[in-house]
């Protein structure tokens, strides 16, 4: 599957997964936080999503950790971890990435897979554009064992910026001759 087909499939899947709002949670705006959202995300998330803006010369970071009811912290299908497809498209692949300059994952997440860490629902793609950001965030992949470049979509899309974080031994092995 080429990158254009991958993007079209992900966007179509996200568009089909619109759901009604999740369980209502009362949340106050954290001090100094920046509100992110549009009418669509506010309806599904029940309000704004808040992120900490960068301060001084330090970047802003957001970390998404998930845990299933049985205590599992990893899954091949993120929608299996709690809120189903709404959580997957609105939070996991949505609001947590929409304002990001970069998204980071471990090599196990992308190794041999057809994955790009981005937003896919048309409303989120539009929100990202309204924030003045490029279509896809920079992809950061951390690995201690290296990656087979030919097996990972994320490493084979010239217009997709990728930063690979590894140890010197593997950096030397992955450098083209």
Predicted regions: what is each one?
Residues 2-69, 73-177:
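Active-site ligand-binding patch in enzyme domains
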């Amino acid at each position: 599957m080429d990158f254009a087909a991958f993007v079209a499939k992900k966007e179509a899947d996200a568009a089909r997964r619109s759901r009604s709002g999740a369980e209502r949670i009362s949340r106050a705006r954290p001090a100094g936080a920046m509100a992110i959202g549009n009418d669509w995300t506010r309806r599904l998330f029940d309000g704004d999503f808040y992120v900490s803006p960068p301060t001084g010369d330090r970047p802003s970071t957001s970390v998404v950790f998930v845990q299933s009811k049985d205590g599992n912290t990893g899954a091949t299908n993120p929608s299996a971890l709690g809120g189903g497809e709404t959580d997957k498209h609105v939070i996991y692949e949505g609001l947590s990435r929409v304002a990001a300059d970069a998204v980071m994952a471990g090599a196990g997440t992308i190794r041999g897979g057809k994955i790009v860490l981005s937003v896919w629902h048309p409303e989120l793609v539009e929100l990202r554009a309204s924030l003045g950001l490029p279509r896809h965030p920079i992809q950061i992949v951390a690995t201690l064992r290296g990656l087979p470049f030919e097996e990972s979509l994320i490493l084979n899309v010239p217009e997709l910026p990728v930063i690979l974080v590894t140890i010197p031994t593997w950096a030397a092995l992955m450098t083209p001759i």
